[in-house]
């Protein structure tokens, strides 16, 4: 259970701060503990969701992010040739919002992008959009934990990975 002012990842919706913990009747005569969440990035959004929502998870702390960044050079591309299966798998990863899986997705699509550039081709629009969304989700979490601007995360990651 989260506390007020905690930061949480709400699947692919992004990072939110728990503003309040309330009791709300989502079903008649069945009060349920709910979180009132406010978005941290982008358009200000407020959401009320049950505390039992499986899409909510704690934002990774700095140590967890450091470990993930250290492991990134060891990750290999996990490209799925079947376009439909790839889209389904990647959408599921985006919905889940797990940082490690997002990093794996980014590496897979980025590796494919580099291979295509060698042949003077480009990614499909869907793959490019998924790469952008995955980077955005991961950068939000890193930005919050490191207390840096989201726009600075890519440069920070590049400098960290160059030193590995």
Residue locations for each model-derived region?
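A positional/architectural concept
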Residues: 1-57
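Charge/polar-rich, low-complexity and marginally structured segments
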Residues: 54-164
């Amino acid at each position: 259970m989260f506390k007020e002012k905690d930061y949480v990842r709400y699947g692919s919706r992004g990072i939110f701060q728990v503003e309040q913990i309330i009791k709300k009747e989502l079903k008649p005569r069945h009060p349920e503990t709910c979180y009132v969440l406010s978005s941290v990035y982008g358009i200000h959004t407020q959401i009320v969701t049950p505390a039992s929502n499986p899409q909510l998870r704690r934002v990774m702390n700095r140590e967890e992010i450091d470990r993930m960044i250290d492991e990134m050079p060891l990750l290999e591309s996990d490209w799925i040739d079947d376009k439909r299966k790839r889209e389904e798998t990647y959408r599921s990863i985006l919905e889940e919002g797990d940082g490690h899986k997002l990093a794996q997705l980014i590496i897979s699509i980025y590796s494919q992008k580099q291979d295509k550039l060698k042949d003077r081709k480009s990614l499909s629009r869907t793959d490019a959009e998924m790469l952008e969304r995955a980077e955005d989700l991961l950068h939000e979490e890193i930005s919050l934990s490191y207390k840096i601007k989201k726009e600075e995360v890519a440069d920070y990651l590049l400098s960290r990975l160059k030193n590995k």
